[in-house]
């Protein structure tokens, strides 16, 4: 019997997906690398993919756009997403970003919300810097190396690549906000692929347990995918305790939007997260 295929779009392959792909019982994953969160939004609206792996804040922002407004986070695939604000040499503190062009994926949703909150906390006015859309993490690194912009948020291994090229670490999202959540799986509630996504969550849960119990096998899966051992170990360290999105992380995303006066500040956990697939397919209770 042929395996079912799930269509998923992401910036970089998440650890659990790489580990799950080694399991013969797993679904076939048709993965599509995207260059921006707008590509993810458009693909979900058009029904070209079944789910995306992305910043959970995107689900909040997308539900405020013209369109279906039925996006929900159905799982969380990492404990947190490590994000480093990388800048040109000589700009090693946030006050040095006044007047700077800062490269982002999108100006109103995603990881940019945490970035804006950090700048706000540092007392940098919203008219004292410019957010310049430059695409996903790889695209932002390429733009930074091409001397476009002054700073951007990067995750591993892209932050290390920027530092090796002469840029400096300016700030860490995790140091500012320890409860910052990892990437989530976002889908539309009206999607016909609900059962398919649920079956994929079963695959990811088996992978999560394997990472926890047999990290050496998880490391091998990552290295086999072409990533260095250091990247594998970093991913393994961020293995979540559960696929259920954390209430603390979601609350932080809402708090950031409230502090910044962004749409979605009146959201609550059920408006952002549909954890019923985790309950139905994995058996976890809230």
Spans of features found by a protein language model:
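Conserved C-terminal helix/tail region of periplasmic/extracytoplasmic solute-binding proteins
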Residues: 262-286
């Amino acid at each position: 019997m042929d395996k079912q295929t799930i269509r998923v779009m992401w910036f970089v392959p998440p650890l659990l997906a790489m580990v799950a792909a080694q399991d013969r019982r797993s679904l076939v994953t048709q993965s599509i690398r995207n260059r921006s969160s707008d590509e993810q939004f458009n693909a979900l609206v058009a029904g070209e993919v079944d789910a995306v792996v992305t910043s959970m804040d995107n689900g909040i922002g997308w539900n405020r756009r013209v369109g279906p407004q039925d996006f929900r986070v159905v799982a969380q695939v990492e404990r947190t997403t490590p994000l480093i604000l990388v800048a040109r040499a000589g700009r090693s503190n946030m006050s040095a970003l006044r007047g700077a062009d800062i490269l982002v994926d999108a100006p109103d949703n995603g990881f940019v919300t945490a970035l804006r909150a950090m700048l706000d906390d540092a007392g940098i006015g919203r008219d004292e810097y410019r957010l310049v859309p430059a695409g996903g993490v790889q695209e932002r690194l390429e733009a930074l190396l091409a001397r476009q912009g002054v700073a951007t948020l990067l995750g591993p291994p892209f932050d290390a690549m920027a530092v090796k090229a002469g840029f400096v670490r300016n700030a860490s999202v995790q140091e500012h906000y320890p409860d910052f959540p990892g990437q989530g799986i976002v889908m539309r509630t009206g999607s016909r692929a609900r059962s398919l996504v649920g079956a994929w969550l079963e695959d990811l849960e088996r992978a999560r347990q394997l990472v926890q119990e047999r990290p050496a096998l998880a490391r091998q899966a990552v290295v086999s995918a072409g990533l260095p051992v250091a990247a594998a170990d970093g991913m393994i360290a961020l293995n979540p305790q559960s696929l259920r999105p954390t209430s603390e992380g979601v609350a932080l995303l809402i708090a950031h939007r409230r502090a910044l006066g962004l749409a979605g500040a009146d959201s609550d956990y059920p408006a952002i997260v549909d954890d019923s697939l985790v309950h139905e397919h994995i058996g976890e209770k809230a």
